[in-house]
Amino acid sequence: TAVYTIQAGTPENFAVKACGRYYPERVDDVAWENDLVAFRTYGPALQKSGERAFGYDVWTKYNTTEPVVEARYASELNPETKAKIAELKKTDPKAAQELYKSVSYHVDHGNGLDCYKVGPTLGGGTAALMPDGEIVYPYCYATQDILDNGPLRFTVKLVYNPLNIKGDSTVVETRVITLDAGSHLNKTVVVYDNLKETTPVVAGIVLHEPDGAV
């Protein structure tokens, strides 16, 4: 038998090792990270644009255990820099490309980068229903709700637009994604409401041709 005593005290302060944010300024991305790795998923503004990106994006981190995602977005999306790049494209495309590379999160600036190409795939671990042997891609989330935001855990709840499964257009997917400090992997709980019958589920780890690079 164990005896536990609850008493008032001062909570211990922890350095932030897991955190994330909704980025309306970047077509509704939700991006999150811990001390080892970072991820993002895509939202309704990107879907409205017509770009096809269904899965999770994976960003590498090294040489640091501190949060880096906020700084990467700030560099990539800086309006003054974007305006300068646009101007240079008219007169000096090479200089424009060099300036872009100097601020882009697709280039390693010493602590990692976004080197993973998602596109119209399941990306890095996204789940999808597969009735009759065909993947039904979930596209981008419809709503997001951040439930935990550090210092040691990030959790977000994503609800998706209804899917059409074998003629039934009422199937709604909900995901609760959790990333803890010290883990390279998310824990994701996936629920499909209104699914009428048992249906296979697949998860994507996409390898790109021709050499199988991720």
Predicted segment positions?
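Long, contiguous hydrophobic alpha-helical segments, chiefly transmembrane helices and signal peptides
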Residues: 1, 30-32, 38-41, 124, ...
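Acidic, contiguous internal or C-terminal segments within carbohydrate-active enzymes
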Residues: 146-149, 154-199
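Solvent-exposed N-terminal domain segments of exported/luminal and surface proteins
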Residues: 6-134
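A mature extracytoplasmic/lumenal domain signature
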Residues: 6, 43-45, 158-162, 205-207
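Short secondary-structure junctions
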Residues: 143-145, 213
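Extended acidic/polar, glycine-enriched regions
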Residues: 1-25, 199-214
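C-terminal globular interaction/adhesion domains in large, modular proteins
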Residues: 89, 135-142, 149-154, 158
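A short, polar/proline- and glycine-enriched secondary-structure boundary/capping micro-motif
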Residues: 50-53, 167-168, 212-213
